[in-house]
């Protein structure tokens, strides 16, 4: 049992504060939250909008900073709202509304908001690990902006809690080049997927897993989205993913409890560093 792969069950499109408890109570140890930006590259709402996944309400939202405060409560030990199981948050950054030259600025503004409203200026803030998920390889300067702002504000150590993802289903080699340009090594999650309304094969997941498991790969963790069926869950686990994003965390939980999967996998806890590649 000591060598089971830790799995992150990632609740999809958790954009209202009330949904945090809803998804964690169904078995999610991680959530994905959409972040929309205004014209000045300020994070504005936790909002997805239409269209979104089949069977979901696309329009739930909060003001970004309000959501961060709710998230902080849910991930701060001792808080009455604390959810011990919630250990990772993926911010799906909707930077498509921005010009490429605003990416750095968006990163700075995002960092300022997280520092104040989530990390409580470094004073016993939320403890979850954070993945900044960027849809466009050209927006890699967002990462530098984020890092520079935390450093400027005196909290470079918080980058220990921050990881990265490019979510555009780009060629894995091109993703690697973007990280080189950004000067990033480590803390890398690689997503692959499509809306639950459409089927998608696992060929790119297999490529990402192969990179992760190779001696000179740059990827630390691979996740697949959006998975709502038991059969797809099994296929993804068989392919060796580390995370599964879902609208139904209880479905993923059920599969992980099946005898064949219980032997090889377990639900990740706070003690599982999400930046460390799992070695079989």
Swiss-Prot record:
GO cellular component, one term: extracellular region
Compartment annotation: Secreted
Cofactor note: Binds 1 Mg(2+) ion per subunit.
Cofactors named for this entry: Mg(2+)
Catalyzed chemical reaction(s): an N-(acyl)-sphingosylphosphocholine = an N-(acyl)-sphingosyl-1,3-cyclic phosphate + choline; an N-(acyl)-sphingosylphosphoethanolamine = an N-(acyl)-sphingosyl-1,3-cyclic phosphate + ethanolamine; a 1-acyl-sn-glycero-3-phosphocholine = a 1-acyl-sn-glycero-2,3-cyclic phosphate + choline; a 1-acyl-sn-glycero-3-phosphoethanolamine = a 1-acyl-sn-glycero-2,3-cyclic phosphate + ethanolamine
Record-linked SUPFAM superfamilies: PLC-like phosphodiesterases
Signal peptide bounds: none
Name of the protein: Dermonecrotic toxin LsSicTox-alphaIA1
Organism annotation: Loxosceles similis
């Amino acid at each position: 049992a000591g060598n089971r792969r830790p799995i992150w069950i990632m609740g999809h499109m958790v954009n209202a504060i009330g949904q945090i408890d809803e998804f964690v109570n169904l078995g999610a140890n991680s959530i994905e939250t959409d972040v929309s930006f205004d014209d000045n590259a300020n994070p504005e709402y936790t909002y997805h909008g239409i269209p979104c996944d089949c069977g979901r309400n696309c329009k739930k939202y909060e003001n970004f900073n309000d959501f961060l405060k709710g998230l902080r409560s849910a991930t701060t030990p001792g808080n009455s709202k604390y959810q011990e199981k919630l250990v990772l948050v993926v911010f799906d950054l909707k930077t498509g509304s921005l010009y490429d030259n605003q990416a750095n600025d968006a990163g700075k503004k995002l960092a300022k908001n997280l520092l104040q409203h989530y990390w409580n200026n470094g004073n016993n803030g939320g403890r979850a690990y954070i993945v900044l998920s960027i849809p466009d390889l050209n927006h890699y300067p967002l990462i530098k902006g984020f890092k520079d702002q935390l450093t400027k504000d005196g909290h470079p150590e918080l980058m220990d809690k921050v990881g990265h993802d490019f979510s555009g289903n780009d060629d894995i080699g091109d993703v690697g080049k973007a990280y080189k340009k950004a000067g990033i090594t480590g803390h890398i999650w690689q997503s692959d997927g499509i809306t639950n309304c459409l089927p998608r094969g696992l060929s790119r997941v297999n490529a990402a897993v192969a990179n992760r498991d190779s001696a000179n790969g740059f990827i630390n963790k691979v996740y697949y989205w959006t998975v709502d069926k038991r059969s797809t869950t099994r296929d993804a686990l068989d392919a060796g993913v580390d995370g599964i994003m879902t609208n139904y965390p209880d479905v993923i939980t059920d599969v992980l409890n099946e005898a064949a999967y219980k032997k090889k996998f377990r639900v990740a806890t706070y003690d599982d560093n999400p930046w460390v590649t799992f070695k079989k």
